[in-house]
Regions:
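Short secondary-structure boundary/capping segments
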Residues: 115-117
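Short acidic/His/Gly/Ser-rich catalytic and metal-binding motifs that mark active-site loops
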Residues: 108-113, 146-149
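Blade-edge beta-strand/turn elements of extracellular beta-propeller
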Residues: 1-7, 59-81, 123-168
């Protein structure tokens, strides 16, 4: 596949996870890609475009043609103010098959004085904005659905948080 990935500083292809622990058939494999995309900009530009985001896509792996097919967007996360502290680890739990997505604080305002409104309460900022998916480890199904109630509440995105306060 060809992806137009923003690669400024710590943006880019952030994580890859593949299903199967040796027990599943090769043609049942799913591949998860986690990357930063900023529309209408060159890959290495430090964009503050509102279309900029970190995305998790699920693909089926076509073994016959060695291709990723049927892309499905399962999670959209912020990428601003960035371009640092995007995190990026994807992990699949072999036992329950949940997907864990790590995302950093995206270079919060304490370190980037020109940006405002990006510090959230999950970063232990008392007067921060409500959680928006950044600064945590998120847990979801392979279809992108929340798993029960999260650590912070029942509403989206609170129900995705498995851990919070993650800097990078």
């Amino acid at each position: 596949i060809h992806l137009n990935v923003s690669s400024k500083d710590e943006r880019g292809l952030l994580g890859i996870a593949v299903t199967g622990n040796g027990e599943s058939k090769q043609d049942d494999r799913l591949v998860f890609l986690y990357y930063t995309y900023c529309p209408k900009v060159k890959a290495n530009v430090n964009s503050t475009s509102q279309g900029c985001g970190n995305y998790v896509y699920r693909y089926k792996f076509d073994t016959e043609n060695s291709k990723l097919i049927e892309p499905q967007l399962i999670l959209t996360l912020p990428a601003l103010p960035g371009p640092s502290h995007n995190g990026g680890v994807l992990e699949l739990d072999d036992k329950d098959e949940n997907l864990y997505v790590a995302i950093g604080d995206l270079q919060s305002t304490r370190f980037n004085k020109n940006q405002t409104g990006y510090d959230t309460t999950v970063q232990n900022i008392v007067n921060g904005t409500p959680p928006d998916g950044r600064a945590g480890i998120l847990r979801l199904t392979q279809d992108g659905k929340p798993i029960g109630n999260g650590r912070l509440g029942e509403e989206y995105p609170l129900n995705l948080y498995y851990a919070y306060g993650v800097k990078n």
